[in-house]
Structure formats: C-alpha cells, structure tokens
C-alpha cells in the first residue's frame, strides 16, 4: 500500500455570481488539487484554495510548494504511516497552509479508503447532520431581501450576512431582513474585520436579539481591543482572520478571552489534522466551534465536514463554499437537504471524479 503516483494540478472553477465582503469583491476561484495513488490502485484526493488576504499565500505559492515538496515526502511511502507523513508535511509546508491542507486532505481520504470507511468514522463520529449557513454578500437592501428569499426557497434558513463597509447600512439590512422574514430565518453576521470599536458597539446595540453571532468584527491584529470589549459582545464574537492555526487558538484561551467562538477553516490552519488540534483545544476550554471555508471544491468542503462531525465542540457549519461554483471536478462528498448537511456512506471523503 505504497504511494506510487502523485499528481498536482490547478483548476479555474469560477463563480456563478461575484460577491462583496468588507475588503474585496470576489469573482474568480482557482483551486489546486492533489491526487495520490497507491500501488494497489486506491486514490486519495485533496484541494487547496489559498486566502491571500488572510494568510499571504497565493495560488502560485500553493502549486509551487506542492510541486517541490510533496514527492520527496510521500513518494514510495506506505499509507499506513499516514500520521507520521502528516507530521512531516506539517513541517515542510508550514508557510503555505492551503498547500498543506490539500496534501493533508488527500492523505486522510486515502487512509480512510484503504480501511474502507467514511473518513468521519475513522476520525470518530460525533454528529450525523447539522445545518449550514449560506452567505449573502454586501449589497443594497432590495437585493439582500431578494437573495434571502431565493435561499429560503432552496431550503436554507440560516443566513450569514456580510457586513463591514457601512455600519448604518448594515444595521438597516439586518432590521429589514428581520421585519420581512421574522422567525423563518436565523441570522449570523460576518464583518470581515470591517468595524472600529465604536461601530461595533453601535451595531451590537441596534441588532441585539436579531443576530446569533458576529464573525471577526475588528481587525485581526486588534486582539487586545477585542479582549477589552464587554463579555456580552465577546461571547457572541467568532474568531476568523485572527485564528489561523493552533498557535493562535492557544493564545486566545487565556483570560479575558476575546472570542466565544472559533471559526476553523482548513485553508487557514493547514488541513484536517491541524483543524482537529484546534478543535480539541476549544473543546477542553468550552469554546464553540464553527467550521467555515473559502470558495472551495467539494473535495475540501467534504474534508471540513468530516472533521466537523468528529468534534464534540462543533456547533455551527458555514460550508457553502462549493454551492456557487460554476464547475467542479468531483461530485458527491456530502448530502445537502433543506440546508442540512450529512456525509455519504462511501469510503474516504465520498467524492467521485466527474
């Protein structure tokens, strides 16, 4: 069961529609894929979608790191040594977390397939299904309401509203959504570092009781300012851009805790193994987990879902990153029904090349 072939390539997946967040408008999506094949014909696949604005990693850096560093570590190695191989990869690809995530996901997929198990059952299943949020970008009120209506019609009831450009317009959108849809929806907010402290206080005061929680309200480097906020705000604030890997998670466990929720993204932390490291810390510290994503192939969305379902600390999913892709290279990976996600019963990630 030795890895005999490693294939690395880049795909332009594109979006069906662009969307705007606090610091950019996104209209294009490129992912780097890794395919591992053993000498007995079993394959494992992984995908990387770097977030340059968050981690500094470009798609070129992702592809280059994998092309240069993967084969010396994995070529000819026995998949039964996958956890040792993951440790080697963690060291070699530490500066390119999306590249590390692609390799990590492929190894996990391959290991679970070798054992004939869905990945979550190899990791230790805790959850069978959970609802995911779906994202509405920054847009005028009329378009916000129309998009919310569309998503409700598709079975989603949890909406993540992007904010952070204009706090008064943000407040108006939240209030109008509540007036229009009331108990039909649950709202979460993602400010993407867009607020100053005074704006956050104002937003919180005007929307209290309407929003379940707010993601990354202040800039990532303003950790001390987050710690000085009232506990009522910190408890419903989720760390995103502030939380890259396990080291960041450990730092945020100390009082006063700046966030009550951690948002784990495989592309920030380096894949399933580092993600579960963060999850274990959060679980011991009674911090709730959300598992999020970039614009990603079903491959890595499935990886995040399997990891999420193996952690007792998981409370929230925000795994809509493949839903607006114009194309993908796989199908399967998960079953989505009325906004609820569950894994398939297929071995590994449960994805199939198209």
Curated annotation (Swiss-Prot):
Q: Which cofactor does it need?
A: Mg(2+)
Name the positions where substrate binds.
Answer: 135, 160-162, 265, 295, 318-320
Disulfide bond among keywords: no
Task: Kindly list the positions annotated as binding Mg(2+).
Answer: 190, 215, 240
How the cofactor is bound: the record states:
Binds 1 Mg(2+) ion per subunit.
Can the keyword Magnesium be found in this entry's annotation?
Answer: yes
- Name the Enzyme Commission number(s) assigned to this protein: 5.1.1.-
Pfam families per the UniProt record, alphabetical: MR_MLE_C, MR_MLE_N
A GO term for molecular function: racemase and epimerase activity, acting on amino acids and derivatives
- Major enzyme class: isomerase
Tell me which UniProt keywords the record has, alphabetically.
Isomerase, Magnesium, Metal-binding
Q: What is a biological process (GO) this protein takes part in?
A: peptide metabolic process
Q: Which domain of life is it from?
A: Bacteria
**Comment field (misc):** Part of a large, functionally divergent protein family. Protein modeling and substrate docking was used to predict the substrate specificity, prior to biochemical analysis.
Q: Which family does it belong to?
A: Belongs to the mandelate racemase/muconate lactonizing enzyme family.
Role, per record? Catalyzes the epimerization of L-Lys-L-Arg to L-Lys-D-Arg (in vitro). Catalyzes the epimerization of positively charged dipeptides, with a preference for substrates with a basic amino acid in the second position. Has epimerase activity with L-Lys-L-Lys, L-Arg-L-Arg, L-Val-L-Arg, L-Val-L-Lys and L-Ala-L-Arg (in vitro).
Could you tell me what this protein is called? L-Lys-D/L-Arg epimerase
Q: What is the lineage of its organism?
A: Bacteria, Pseudomonadati, Thermodesulfobacteriota, Desulfobacteria, Desulfobacterales
């Amino acid at each position: 069961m030795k890895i005999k072939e490693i294939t690395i390539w880049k795909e332009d997946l594109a979006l069906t529609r662009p969307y705007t967040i606090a610091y950019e408008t996104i209209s294009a999506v490129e992912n780097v894929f890794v395919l591992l094949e053993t000498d007995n014909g079993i394959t494992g696949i992984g995908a990387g979608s770097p977030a340059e604005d968050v981690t500094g990693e470009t798609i070129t850096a992702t592809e280059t790191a994998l092309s240069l560093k993967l084969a010396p570590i994995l070529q000819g190695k026995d998949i039964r040594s996958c956890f040792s191989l993951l440790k080697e990869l963690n060291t070699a690809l530490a500066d390119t977390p999306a590249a590390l995530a692609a390799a990590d996901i492929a190894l996990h997929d391959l290991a679970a397939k070798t054992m004939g198990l869905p990945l979550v059952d190899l990791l230790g299943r805790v959850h069978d299904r959970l609802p995911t949020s779906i994202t509405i970008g920054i847009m005028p009120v009329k378009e916000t309401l129309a998009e919310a209506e569309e998503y409700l019609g598709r079975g989603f009831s949890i909406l993540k509203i992007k904010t952070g450009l204009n706090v008064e317009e943000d407040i108006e959108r939240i209030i109008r959504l509540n007036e229009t849809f009331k108990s039909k929806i649950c709202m979460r907010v993602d400010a993407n570092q867009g607020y100053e402290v005074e704006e956050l206080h104002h937003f919180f005061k005007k929307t209290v009781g309407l929003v379940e929680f707010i993601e990354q309200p202040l800039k990532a480097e303003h950790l001390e300012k987050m710690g000085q906020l009232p506990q009522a705000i910190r408890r419903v604030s989720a760390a995103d851009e502030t939380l890259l890997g396990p080291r960041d998670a450990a730092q945020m466990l100390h009082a006063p805790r700046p966030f009550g929720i951690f948002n784990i993204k495989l592309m920030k932390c380096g894949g399933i193994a580092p993600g579960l490291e963060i999850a274990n810390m959060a679980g011991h510290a009674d911090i709730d987990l959300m598992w999020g994503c970039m614009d990603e192939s079903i491959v890595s969305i499935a990886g995040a879902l399997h990891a999420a379902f193996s952690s007792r600390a998981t409370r929230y999913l925000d795994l809509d990153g493949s839903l607006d892709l114009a194309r993908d290279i796989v199908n399967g990976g998960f079953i989505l029904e009325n906004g609820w996600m569950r894994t398939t019963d297929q071995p590994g990630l449960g994805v199939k090349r198209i």
